[in-house]
Structures are given as structure tokens and as C-alpha cells.
């Protein structure tokens, strides 16, 4: 795993790493299911976007311990310069916090936790 001290790490670099980890986890999930590329791509896009990540973030926030909440808070309050038009500023901030959490789980070797979050947020029709 990566050797980063989460207490010193900035929110945006963590979100950058978490974005890659989340997308890879989602892609692996659907590849293992054996979908065709077009179908896989549509399913991945439903989970790898700011709106979806914002929803997931809000659903897991209460279950986090204080160290992870601190990581999320730092990322959410980071000095983000630009925002996409596809979501609100708050959704984008929450998605950034979610991605930072995914990086924190990854750094701490909690990849099973990332997969569990994914499985809990895939609708029955998506499985």
C-alpha cells in the first residue's frame, strides 16, 4: 500500500488517489460480472460521478470514526477552484470527501471496506 500519514495528508491529493481507487474497484466489480463493454461502461458511469459519490458519502458518514471524519472534513473544505456543471458545489465537495475517504481506506489496507461500500450501493438491477 501507499505510505502516507493521513493526519498530514491534504484533502485534494487524497481525493485524487481515491478517485482512481474507486473507479478501479467499480470497474473490477463489473468485469468480474462478465458484462459486455458497453453495458459495463454505462454501469460504471452511474457510480463514478460526483452526484452518485455525494449520495454514497452522505449514507456512510455517520458510521465513520473520528479519524475518517477528519479526513472527509479536510477534503470537503479544501480550496477547490473549479466545479463541473453536472452537479452542485455541495455535491462536488461531498464527492471530493468521499474520494478522500476511499484513499484513506486504501492506504490503511481496508480494501474490503471499499468493496462493501460498493456492494451496498449497487441497486439490485445493477448487480
Curated annotation (Swiss-Prot):
Keywords: Endonuclease, Hydrolase, Nuclease. One of its GO terms (cellular component) is cytoplasm. GO terms for biological process: rRNA processing. The active site is at 19. GO terms for molecular function: ribonuclease III activity; rRNA binding. It holds the Pfam family Ribonuclease_3. InterPro entries: Mini3_fam, RNase_III_dom, RNase_III_sf. Might be a ribonuclease involved in RNA processing. Belongs to the MrnC RNase family. HAMAP family: RNase_Mini_III (MF_01468). This is Mini-ribonuclease 3-like protein. It comes from Ilyobacter polytropus (strain ATCC 51220 / DSM 2926 / LMG 16218 / CuHBu1).
Amino acid at each position: 500500500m501507499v505510505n502516507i500519514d493521513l493526519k498530514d495528508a491534504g484533502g485534494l491529493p487524497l481525493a485524487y488517489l481515491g478517485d482512481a481507487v474507486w473507479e478501479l474497484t467499480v470497474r473490477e466489480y463489473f468485469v468480474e460480472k462478465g458484462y459486455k463493454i458497453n453495458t459495463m461502461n454505462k454501469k460504471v458511469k452511474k457510480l463514478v460521478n460526483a452526484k452518485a459519490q455525494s449520495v454514497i458519502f452522505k449514507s456512510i458518514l455517520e458510521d465513520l470514526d473520528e479519524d475518517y471524519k477528519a479526513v472527509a472534513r479536510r477534503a470537503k473544505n479544501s480550496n477547490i477552484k473549479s466545479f463541473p456543471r453536472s452537479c452542485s458545489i455541495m455535491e462536488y465537495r461531498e464527492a471530493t470527501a468521499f474520494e478522500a475517504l476511499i484513499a484513506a481506506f486504501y492506504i490503511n489496507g481496508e480494501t474490503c471496506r471499499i468493496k462493501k461500500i460498493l456492494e451496498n450501493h449497487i441497486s439490485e438491477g445493477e448487480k
